[in-house]
Amino acid sequence: MSFLSVSRLAPKLLNSKNATYFLVAARNASASTTNLKDVLADLIPKEQSRIKNFKQQYGKTNIGQITVDMVYGGMRGMKGLVYETSVLDPEEGIRFRGYSIPECQKLLPKAPGGEEPLPEGLFWLLVTGQVPTEEQVNWVSKEWAKRAALPSHVVTMLDNFPTNLHPMSQFSAAITALNSESSFARAYSEGVHKTKYWEFVYEDSMDLIAKLPCIAAKIYRNLYREGSSIGAIDSNLDWSHNFTNMLGYSEAQFTELMRLYLTIHSDHEGGNVSAHTSHLVGSALSDPYLSFSAAMNGLAGPLHGLANQEVLVWLTALQKEMGGEVSDERMRDYIWNTLKSGRVVPGYGHAVLRKTDPRYTCQREFALKHLPNDPMFKLVAQLYKIVPNVLLEQGKAKNPWPNVDAHSGVLLQYYGMTEMNYYTVLFGVSRALGVLAQLVWSRALGFPLERPKSMSTEGLMTLVGAKSG
């Protein structure tokens, strides 16, 4: 059994008497090196062999049925992708390589004096399936700092965008322009053997993740801070700390929030628009810059990455209409009136989840610790108490519980980041951790070009024996 397989057993052992022994053994499995690429080079052949054997034995096994509703319904619930880095359970929420968010908060290394996990540690976990040591996380921080500088043509491009161009459009365009630096594109054009693809995708992915905070911070400064300088990367600081410094925020609590935000938004299984897009475009052997840029164009859509902005707009309108503190009864009436008018309560419900999103829960815990008396947080907390019961009474919602978007905007606002148009860029910086970790594995495992079969309505009707008319 490969280490990746064994590591997925860790959550089941966390509460057992063997938990401490197991976690020490897991860390020691590759703790002798701090170089992530070396660890990957050891893991990949074992995983290739494991999957080859699995396919030989079970390749023709049926794993589910496809209905007409699934085909018309955005392929919802259809099992059609292999995505290794995270799995979304309807009852538990997201698990990163088998670890829940609370487990990641407990196990992943933190900054000195910090309480939230470092995104570098999560990236190591997503790539390897292993909980990293502090030394390994520190290596990633320094590696990203070393790779962070932007080429001059990208800086010039960002400085010349019109101010009315949406931050996500700027973000995507700048990422596409980084394609000039692609190691993978260059190696492919020179005829590199396909068994080496993953090495160059890894290099591009590390470079891209390193540069994203610089791109995002430059967009923020150009649009909202009169084009002031983002400053220089400090190789002694972690990825999130450098990011908040470049954005112009010096408060330690905001940096802690950013570490949490970038960790919990990083990955959410493979079927969501941004993850699936990067997987699809990458399957054409487009380099990581092109693949991730395409993913960001999907994330920019209002049904994917703009939800936290919509929540904040709705909360602000609610607060303005209702005034100061509102009784639970009045709030309940307001929610009912919202639903009866044909509108929805933004931030509630999820395509897969059937319980409160654990990403919401950890943000709520952060707020309870750091901003318990903030009026907007108190409003969010009041809604959490009322909305699910109203939605259950209405009887239409499959999931009446809050999702991640119900909370994140309120936290950012509290620390002074009020520019709602920018929030999806933060989401994009975070999402790189998950989709690029998977992209490396997709090339390592030799996943082919994605090419599902499409059908016309007439063809579907013929297939199921329905009469057209």
From Swiss-Prot:
Example GO molecular function: identical protein binding
Pathway: Carbohydrate metabolism; tricarboxylic acid cycle; isocitrate from oxaloacetate: step 1/2
SUPFAM superfamilies attached to this UniProt entry: Citrate synthase (SSF48256)
Keyword Cell wall biogenesis/degradation applies: no
EC number: 2.3.3.1
Transit peptide residues according to the UniProt entry: 1-30
InterPro entries: Citrate_synth-like_lrg_a-sub, Citrate_synth-like_sm_a-sub, Citrate_synthase, Citrate_synthase_AS, Citrate_synthase_euk, Citrate_synthase_sf
Keywords for the protein's UniProt record, in alphabetical order: Mitochondrion, Transferase, Transit peptide, Tricarboxylic acid cycle
Family label: Belongs to the citrate synthase family.
PANTHER family the UniProt entry points to: CITRATE SYNTHASE, CITRATE SYNTHASE, MITOCHONDRIAL
Identification of the protein by name: Citrate synthase, mitochondrial
The organism of origin for this protein: Thunnus obesus (Bigeye tuna)
